[in-house]
């Protein structure tokens, strides 16, 4: 009986090791795969947004009419919408999609405010420039964490 019990324990140990080894080799992912092109796109759009705010800050406040920046607003909006679409179609990518949606919503709010007031003050520009930097850093880090 002890021989049978020892044999059973040996088989149990072997099967446990095989099972454990197979589990170590398996990875269940609940996040999208890393995409270097998405990270580069985030950085490219971040640069455009930073340049946009830099240009506004370099322009005297009396010359910051919305019509002079309308095309830039539309180009950046289109880039953010394209990034949102790219993130949305990737499986397990809700966080990145939500972050992109936040950036797009902030951008649209800024555009509407500029359109309504037909100017933007320096303090608001500096604040919003920093906000976007934080959002884009979070987006890029989030994509990088998928590696």
What are the functions of these language-model segments?
Residues 1-17:
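Bacterial N-terminal signal peptides that target proteins for export
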Residues 87-115:
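Heptad-repeat alpha-helical coiled-coil/4-helix-bundle sensor or tether segments in soluble regions
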Residues 106-147:
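C-terminal amphipathic alpha-helix
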Residues 66-74, 94-101, 122-130:
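Short, charged, amphipathic alpha-helical segments
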Residues 33-57:
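Post-signal peptide N-terminal segment of mature Sec-exported envelope proteins
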Residues 54-93:
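Alpha-helical segments in soluble extracytoplasmic regions
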Residues 28-40, 63-70, 119, 123-126:
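Short, solvent-exposed segments of well-ordered alpha helices
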Residues 21-25:
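C-terminal motif of bacterial Sec signal peptides marking the signal peptidase cleavage site
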């Amino acid at each position: 009986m002890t021989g049978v019990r020892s044999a059973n324990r040996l088989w149990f140990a072997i099967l446990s090791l095989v099972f454990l080894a197979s589990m170590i080799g398996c990875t269940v992912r609940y996040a999208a795969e890393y995409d270097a092109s998405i990270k580069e796109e985030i950085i490219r759009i971040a640069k455009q947004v930073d340049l946009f705010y830099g240009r506004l800050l370099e322009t005297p406040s009396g010359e910051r009419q919305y019509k002079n920046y309308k095309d830039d607003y539309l180009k950046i909006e289109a880039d953010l919408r394209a990034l949102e679409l790219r993130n949305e179609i990737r499986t397990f990518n809700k966080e990145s999609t939500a972050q992109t949606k936040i950036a797009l919503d902030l951008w649209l709010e800024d555009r509407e405010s500029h359109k309504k007031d037909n100017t933007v003050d320096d303090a608001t520009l500096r604040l919003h420039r920093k906000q976007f930097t934080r959002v884009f850093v979070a987006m890029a880090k989030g994509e990088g964490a998928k590696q």
